[in-house]
């Protein structure tokens, strides 16, 4: 696989392609300064990123859209050069809500289509505008999932030209098989966005996805920010790992660059999230070196099956994906 800063798209099973590195745009709406996301996306595009990963529930898609449109207006990129991934949240799984939800994202972005639209989690929550619905006692309000019905509504969005490719996120093997074996399947999921890094290499899920032509996109590819609401903070920080740092010295790279290179060398798309402008540039400098087979094996051996993003608050949901081995 010949990847370079100028040319690093890999094929998807539907004939489209995806840039192997993207900018993640997740942010805490309350603590992120206005405009930080737009600035980050503009710097990323100037740096060479062509893949932006976002979601309506990040509450910053308007900034992402503004940045993309500004770079198109400047003549820096064309719309077809940019790959935008949007997400269908858990409160919008009801089939008749899928298209209006995507159309709302398109209105916010002020774009005609998204390149990839994915079901963000396999768990359905009570439909409505409340992103995290709970009752008066703080108990989560779930909704019965029907992933196949939701998928059919996604397929209709692709047929209508609102999205080029369809995928999923946080799906385990059983949930992927539900879609793959669906009678009358029109469009296969092209990707599954999951946590993936040297402490959580996902060998079995990766193999299953490769057998079915499903690309793995790695969120939290550098470990993760250590927010105790979401993250198992007892887990060791990935970027302090001795092996990753010694490889960094060998190649005159940071541990983060080694980690990103490791995943792209195995065909895993990475979407490191950063609003730090220097780090955005640094994360992209991974095309001017490659790891040896031996080094790849050494990094693979770091796997501890440590999942940072456990989503434990939803572990009693019938479709909670992480009870299964993979």
From Swiss-Prot:
Protein name: Aldo-keto reductase family 1 member D1
GO cellular component: cytosol
Binding site for substrate: 26, 58, 89, 120, 132, 230
Function, in words: Catalyzes the stereospecific NADPH-dependent reduction of the C4-C5 double bond of bile acid intermediates and steroid hormones carrying a delta(4)-3-one structure to yield an A/B cis-ring junction. This cis-configuration is crucial for bile acid biosynthesis and plays important roles in steroid metabolism. Capable of reducing a broad range of delta-(4)-3-ketosteroids from C18 (such as, 17beta-hydroxyestr-4-en-3-one) to C27 (such as, 7alpha-hydroxycholest-4-en-3-one).
Origin species: Homo sapiens
CDD domains assigned to the protein according to its UniProt record, in alphabetical order: AKR_AKR1D1-3
Primary enzyme class: oxidoreductase
Organism taxonomic ancestry: Eukaryota, Metazoa, Chordata, Craniata, Vertebrata
Main location: cytoplasm
UniProt-annotated catalytic positions: 58
Molecular function via GO: aldo-keto reductase (NADPH) activity; aldose reductase (NADPH) activity; Delta4-3-oxosteroid 5beta-reductase activity; ketosteroid monooxygenase activity; steroid binding; steroid dehydrogenase activity
């Amino acid at each position: 696989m010949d990847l370079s800063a100028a040319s690093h798209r890999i094929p998807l099973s539907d004939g489209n392609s995806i840039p192997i590195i993207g900018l993640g745009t997740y942010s805490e709406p309350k603590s992120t300064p206005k405009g930080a996301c737009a600035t980050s996306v503009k710097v990323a595009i100037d740096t060479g990123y062509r893949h932006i990963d976002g979601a309506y529930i990040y509450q910053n898609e308007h900034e992402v859209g503004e940045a993309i449109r500004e770079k198109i207006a400047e003549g820096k990129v064309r719309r077809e050069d940019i790959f935008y991934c949007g997400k269908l949240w858990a409160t919008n799984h009801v089939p008749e809500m899928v298209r209006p939800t995507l159309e709302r994202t398109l209105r916010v972005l002020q774009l005609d289509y998204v390149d990839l639209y994915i079901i963000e989690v396999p768990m359905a929550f009570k439909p409505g505008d409340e992103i995290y619905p709970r009752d008066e006692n703080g108990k989560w309000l779930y909704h019965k999932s029907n992933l196949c019905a939701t998928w059919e509504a996604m397929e209709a969005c692709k047929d209508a030209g609102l999205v080029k490719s369809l995928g999923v996120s946080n799906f385990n093997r059983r949930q992927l098989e539900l879609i793959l074996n669906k009678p009358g399947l029109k469009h296969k999921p092209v990707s599954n966005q999951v946590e993936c890094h040297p402490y959580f290499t996902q060998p079995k899920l990766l193999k299953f996805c490769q057998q079915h032509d499903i690309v793995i996109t790695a969120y939290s590819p550098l470990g993760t920010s250590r927010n105790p609401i979401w993250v198992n903070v007892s887990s060791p920080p990935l970027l302090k790992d001795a092996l990753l740092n010694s490889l960094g010295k060998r190649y005159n790279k940071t541990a983060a660059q080694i980690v990103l290179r490791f995943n792209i060398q195995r065909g895993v798309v990475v979407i490191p999230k950063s609003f730090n402008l220097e780090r955005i540039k640094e994360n992209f400098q991974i095309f001017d070196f490659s790891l040896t087979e031996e080094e790849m094996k050494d990094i693979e051996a770091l796997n501890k099956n440590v999942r940072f993003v456990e989503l434990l608050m939803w572990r009693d949901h019938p479709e909670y994906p992480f009870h299964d081995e993979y």
